[in-house]
């Protein structure tokens, strides 16, 4: 016989709700600190014991609660932060559901002490497993002191899934760092088993970041806005990149989030200068009208939903690119103590590349007619990329260097004040060539050169299929291809800049790139990957002697080139050795 439908007891319902909200000690800490911040606290102290299993205590100097409010706070769906359906659309507080405290109380032994301003005494409430055991008056300062003991004492199945005390304490520490970065105007302290692990005093965001996340990094301000969002914060140079996303601190209206749209926008902006598998150190604060973002889509509120997702994505990417494009870390500029006033950044209209590369390409081709490739009959010998024409003399980091000479015909040695600067000429030429190709592609296609004797290339079945599917991408890149029977294709013309290189190998590399990610990649990303391949093949590998004039021309071209600090694959273009480092190596005083 099938079991009857029954209404769950309040105790069991609270335990189930706690399963969504309270995953581990760090989850409890998050909810309690968010409550403290919503209460206007400017000083928050956290103590834990045994990784939070035995004890979690959060005390603050917020506005506190009356006796009645303190009792209501332990009831499910009791909150002071929303009143109506309309309030859900304009949430600006960190908490709002009224689930956290009753959920925590249902799986622990809890003691709540609170006193509001104007009251002569505070209120102390003890609860066990969600049941209130006592309510008494107590003496205390204005604020709230909340203690959680023996977490998961009545749900042993949850308890056994916790990690070691050190691991749980580390999770709490990561959370405290994120919280402290979100509110540099608030002091935070964190103790584990009586040992102080973190203490920060009120200051500005830059100081807070340098103390908690970027001790050895130079920070550069990010500030810009569009009609979709306002973006502010700081970023560190690529040298400070990490192997995980742990140093990507992103906040929406003051709330820490791990959102795929935001992370994708950040990675797209850093893609030209970061090696694969590396993630930037960045702290971004995204300000949106409350009605433009829905934070009520996930129990932990780490995920959000944007009303205008594409515009927010493009705003973040564009504002970051404005900073990264000039490679400010090469200029040795120190970030100001406070970001400058926001400057407008204009986001291009949303493109269709998010819908898949083929659909995006169709619209791109329809909107921008591609001119026929320009044909050159005679192949020309290799020469380094010509710097783009400039109406004014170029000044900047690279052109300010004094050329010493070449090392093994592969590295350019330069001097700048008290620094020796080594330039990887292949990486530098590759970046210049890439930006030239990108500009050419955007204005009608890459120059093509017809081969006097067409090459034939025997392709595999999958390679031949890739050629047929993506011929309309390969042609603007400068290739003229035609079927020659079976799986054989004839190459009649190639990009001019690779005419003297192994263009058959280049074509195979491009086909592999298209086959791997063509249908899944955004069009801009796919285009850049392909152009980076062409740029790499267009530059002579290995040793290549250069005259001083050519080296100086390359340096000037680098200053006129976007993202000049790195090659298109993310490798650094230059490396500095200071005089002090040399003196230290040679044991000089």
From Swiss-Prot:
Disulfide bonds: none annotated. GO terms for cellular component: mismatch repair complex. Residues 331-341 have a biased composition (Basic and acidic residues). Keywords: DNA damage, DNA repair. The keyword DNA repair applies. One of its GO terms (biological process) is mismatch repair. Residues 330-355, 374-394 are annotated as: Disordered. GO terms for molecular function: ATP binding; ATP hydrolysis activity; ATP-dependent DNA damage sensor activity; mismatched DNA binding. Pfam families: DNA_mis_repair (PF01119), HATPase_c_3 (PF13589), MutL_C (PF08676). Belongs to the DNA mismatch repair MutL/HexB family. This protein is involved in the repair of mismatches in DNA. It is required for dam-dependent methyl-directed DNA mismatch repair. May act as a 'molecular matchmaker', a protein that promotes the formation of a stable complex between two or more DNA-binding proteins in an ATP-dependent manner without itself being part of a final effector complex. This is DNA mismatch repair protein MutL. It comes from Trichlorobacter lovleyi (strain ATCC BAA-1151 / DSM 17278 / SZ) (Geobacter lovleyi).
